[in-house]
């Protein structure tokens, strides 16, 4: 009984200490928010480029003092909040100078060198959140770290910052895996690099070399999103991939890239493909718009026994060309009451939303 009572007392004491810590953190945050947030936001959105001295004066901040880590953690939180709400309006030069005034780079590098594992990971994520900086000399020790989360966070930050060979890890490790979250983060990094004027890599080499199916698919998607038309001839080799998913994504991308040379191959392989890939082929042919595939689309509709595939074919015909619309009308006149609804759905997409 005494042991149980002691355990309860210990739990209550821990809860009180935890609550007190949260209260203290909240109080510190509120104090910093009241003192800095509005002026930091105003400086960040000011179209005039301000000097370090001007910003320090407006913030009433003494740059000679050594800032405390707890204070700087809150400052980075405020910077993150400003960036997340006003990203497209920010004067990046002023935003970066605020970081100089508070010595944020020094703080982040010290967190990476001396902080706990959690602090290190948070610092790495912060660099991306606030477009901060840490030297490659500090980052390099974590790029091959045995801890997966720390290693990946360091690699993504390196990709964010480096102008050298930031994606070398995909060359070095063909078995490098990507989770869904990793793919989202990597795409955000690519968008950031494009925005700041860094070169976009050619993705096709990793489609060819990666041993991981989802990594191949990710880079095929990026080829499409970045319209890397020069990669189309090599990407066309993926039409022979054993994976249905890789094959389908390659077909979709080749259509969006308008790689017309692939159309005969798509028509040739159509009949032996699973239904999902057949639909991708039809959509790709619709994107290519060569005006040479009307006969194929007509026959494909006539032979299709899957309603989903029939609908994709009708949509392709309807949007293909003037001759495509005539072919659509011709098929509609022949339609029985059972299939007439497919034509109505194609001509009036709102029906899909109302049903």
Q: What do the PLM-derived regions correspond to, one by one?
A:
Residues 326-330, 334-344, 349:
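Alpha-helical oligomerization segments
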Residues 115-116, 146-149, 177-182, 211-212, ...:
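Short inter-helical turns and helix N-cap capping residues of alpha-solenoid HEAT/ARM repeat scaffolds
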Residues 57, 66-69, 92, 98-112, ...:
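Amphipathic alpha-helical scaffolding segments comprising HEAT/armadillo-like alpha-solenoid repeats
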Residues 5-11:
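Gram-positive cell-envelope targeting signals
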Residues 11-111:
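N-terminal topogenic membrane-targeting module
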Residues 1-3:
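Hydrophobic alpha-helical transmembrane segments
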Residues 107-129:
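Alpha-helical segment of the N-proximal tetratricopeptide repeat
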Residues 88-99, 121-131, 152-163, 182-195, ...:
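Structural detector for internal amphipathic alpha-helices that build alpha-solenoid repeat scaffolds
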